[in-house]
């Protein structure tokens, strides 16, 4: 009993506010609305993107499919796509806004009018995670956005609205760069504006949600599962062996014994090594017992399969083979891949492409006001049920009937001329 009194147990609760970060809360602080409980919801989405391999692959696959082989325009106006700003073409802009659209659910462009205000001179991409919306007007319109790449560092807010990181006092937004919402009618007094695409989402008034929002917790599970296995490999001894010594060692001696054991036997580099122990008498021999896994290997295998399927479903990828993931027990998947690709192209990629193409076409109409009757589309290879491919062009949602076919005909004509005159 006396010895038992020397043993104390403590319960340690770990909390990193992960549950709060999943919630895309919109709450007013000072003159703008924070994006997430701690004003870091976009940074949370970036964290998921960078740390979940399957989620990262899904996003990249969608973005690459959306961008396709790039923007195309009718032959007379092709040169308009070459310059969005001094450093980038419209294809460069397309790649960035396609990623933002998929990752955050929206995208933003800085629009700069010419000195004489007759046309848009330059258009730049703005990382959507940098935006925080100003409070809506009485008419329900967002007048503009504050812009910073340090929201999670300097302007992180607590649940109640108070500043979480005490870098600044209340009213920090006053010194932040601000851009009014894109409005050609105000181009004279507002030469720099911001165009923000923020589609309607139930419950969201200021910020969008990505289409995979329902799987945010599942993506976290994927990351934590990888972290669990990584730590298991690094700390090799902890989950597999119980070692009991009978030396009545003091704390310093116990720490030294633990250090020697970890140094000699833990980690992946020591897997399969021989354990040799020399003691002065049998009474002092340590007791080494394996800790049964209780089926944890099978549990985590099933968990991994469940997580993978849920993430794929959230991204509307019906077949894992589209990402190069082989399904166990499947003999052949050619037909499945073709069917899945056709569904993916028409229900996932095409809607993205139509929205982005329409945006580019609208911006070009302000950048080149004298250009009329031009068509813009995204070129891609379309896969058919028999496995054959054909050039396909997706135009904007406001495009007239036949514009896509006209662009396809021009592309085919150009390809034929290049073959005949290499």
Show which residues each predicted segment covers.
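A contiguous, surface-oriented mixed alpha/beta subdomain in the mid-to-C-terminal portion of proteins
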Residues: 193-363, 370-377
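Long, highly charged low-complexity segments enriched in Glu/Asp and Lys/Arg with interspersed Ser/Thr
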Residues: 362-399
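Extended alpha-helical coiled-coil "stalk/arm" regions that scaffold and mediate dimerization/assembly
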Residues: 61-65
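Structured, contiguous alpha/beta core segments that scaffold functional sites
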Residues: 1-59, 69, 74-279, 387-422
């Amino acid at each position: 009993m006396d010895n038992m009194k020397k043993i104390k147990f403590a319960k340690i609760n770990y909390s990193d506010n992960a549950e709060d970060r999943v919630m895309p809360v919109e709450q007013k602080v000072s003159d703008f609305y924070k994006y997430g409980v701690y004003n870091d919801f976009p940074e949370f989405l970036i964290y998921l993107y960078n740390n979940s391999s399957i989620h990262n692959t899904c996003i990249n696959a969608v973005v690459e499919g959306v961008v396709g082989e790039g923007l195309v325009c009718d032959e007379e106006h092709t040169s308009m796509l070459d310059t969005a700003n001094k450093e980038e073409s419209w294809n460069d802009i397309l790649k960035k806004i396609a990623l933002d659209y998929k990752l955050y659910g929206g995208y933003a462009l800085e629009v700069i009018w010419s000195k004489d205000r007759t046309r848009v001179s330059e258009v730049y991409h703005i990382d959507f995670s940098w935006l925080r919306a100003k409070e809506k007007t009485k008419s329900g319109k967002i007048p503009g956005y504050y812009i910073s790449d340090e929201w999670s560092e300097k302007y992180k807010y607590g649940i109640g609205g108070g500043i979480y990181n005490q870098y600044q006092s209340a009213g920090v937004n006053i010194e932040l760069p601000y851009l009014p919402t894109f409005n050609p009618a105000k181009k004279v007094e507002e030469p720099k504006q911001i165009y923000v695409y923020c589609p309607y989402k139930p419950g969201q008034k200021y910020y969008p949600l990505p289409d995979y929002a329902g799987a945010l917790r599942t993506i976290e599970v994927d990351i934590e599962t990888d972290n669990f296995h990584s730590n298991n490999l690094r700390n090799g001894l902890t989950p597999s062996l119980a070692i009991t010594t009978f030396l009545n060692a003091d704390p310093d001696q116990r720490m030294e014994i633990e250090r020697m054991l970890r140094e000699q036997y833990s980690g992946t580099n020591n897997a399969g090594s021989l354990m040799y122990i020399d003691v002065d008498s049998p009474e002092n021999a340590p007791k080494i017992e394996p800790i049964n896994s209780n089926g944890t290997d099978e549990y985590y295998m099933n968990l991994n399969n469940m997580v993978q399927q849920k993430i794929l479903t959230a991204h509307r990828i019906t077949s894992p083979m589209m990402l190069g993931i082989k399904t166990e027990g499947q003999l052949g998947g050619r037909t499945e891949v073709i069917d899945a690709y056709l569904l993916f192209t028409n229900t996932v990629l095409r809607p993205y492409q139509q929205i982005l193409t329409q945006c580019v076409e609208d911006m070009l109409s302000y950048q080149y006001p004298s250009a009329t009757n031009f068509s813009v589309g995204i070129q891609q290879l379309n896969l058919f049920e028999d496995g054959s491919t054909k050039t396909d062009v997706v135009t904007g949602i406001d495009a007239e009937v036949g514009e896509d076919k006209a662009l396809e005909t021009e592309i085919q004509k150009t390809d034929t001329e290049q073959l005949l005159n290499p």
